[in-house]
């Protein structure tokens, strides 16, 4: 499923598609595959759902989100463009025109290189000053 925010990011969720079905999707629809900004990696990032290289190239995601899965089963791919929910916890996306500001419940130190720190963006705190979401970075789309 692909979702486009008006004047903003294009997201794709591939659910639990395993690699063979992804390859079939690519082979059947290769001329119609959209380029996207943020991909939720299929099958929670498990190796059994690893993206075929030709499909990944066609989609051209700027950022990949890997869902919760036991670490030994995850295919991290290019870890410089991924955020894993195992590390980040909950992830919140705030779309503002051509930027997506990303917040996570856990502070992450190994941030994807596609994210930059935007001046004025800060952690989100509750009324007692406790951080409830850490500002992780901004993706330009």
Segments (PLM) and residue ranges:
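Active-site-proximal loop/helix segments of hydrolase catalytic cores
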Residues: 1-74
